[in-house]
Amino acid sequence: MTTVDKLKSLENKLSATNIIEGLYDKYENDSYMYNKIHNYICNQLPSIFESMHQLREQRVTRIEELSCEQDNFIQSFLNNNQYFYNSTTDNYFYYDKLKYVLYNEDDILHHVLSSISRGRNLMSWKHKTKINIMKRIRENSLINSIPESNTIQMVINSLCPTIFDSRNKAKYFLTILGDNIFRKNTTNIHFISPNAKDFIKNLNNISQILIGSNISQTFKYKYHDHSYPECRIVNVNECIKNYNIWSIIINDYTLDILCVAMHYSNRYNNSDEFLLNDCNDSNFVNKVFYIKNVEQTLLVDEFINVFIDIDNKTIVDNKTIVDKQITQITWKNMQYLWKLFLD
């Protein structure tokens, strides 16, 4: 006890003593009241305070027991039931260790309350426990979810070999999606076939509804004077243009795709680092970084070899027969062919 506390205690004792002495003085000529005061102070008051002390001790012990019981219940409930929340869309989700599903808040509340009722021990703290669990769930963001390996394999198998012809390509695509959700490397340009436009658009629409994130901002379908060092190439199978193929993936796996994508972006840091540090297919990596890494003169030479026809013609120049290579093409057409080549 500090000196200040000791002084305060002494003041309280003196104050109480003065009051008691005042009562004795007040009724010293009234034997009935005098005896009542004496009996109350000496006989009843100690019992009253002892009873108060015991009740308080019991209450504290009960609160400690309930607090411990509540903590154990909440921890057990959350460990056995993986609920997540997204504050942007105010959506709740449930993960059964295979698939993620959108979940109604009322259904979660019913699950919580029915679980408390079955245990019986927390009935007196039912409302308080419910509030604490819902608070913990709202703090459990979906972006921090770590999918099980069987979920990851399920997602990769849904994309490969249907849309991507290798698992590395599917993983790269997923990491790009995660980067876009977290707004990483937003200056990068990921060129993808126009055949994938509807697939990306629908995937993005559902992403906006579920988690409020745009997953398509770095995907481009045509070249428009983009900086070469920021360009990446994403190859997809031709069948991605078939609605009947990609619609099944969209309908059945979108939420799982988004969760695995966020996990990959966190795990590999970003899509470029996945290629450079974790992808074992050097040929694939070189294709992705082709525009970024190739020298511009070599790129132009390849463009000329692929798209430009050069005719050998004989012309007369100052009465001399000369063989020259003449290429005739308008600037507008040249730009069109260049974009077509890059696409």
Language model features: what each stretch is:
Residues 1-249, 253:
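Intein modules and their embedded homing endonuclease domains
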Residues 37, 258-261:
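Short alpha-helical scaffolding segments that buttress acidic/His motifs in well-ordered protein cores
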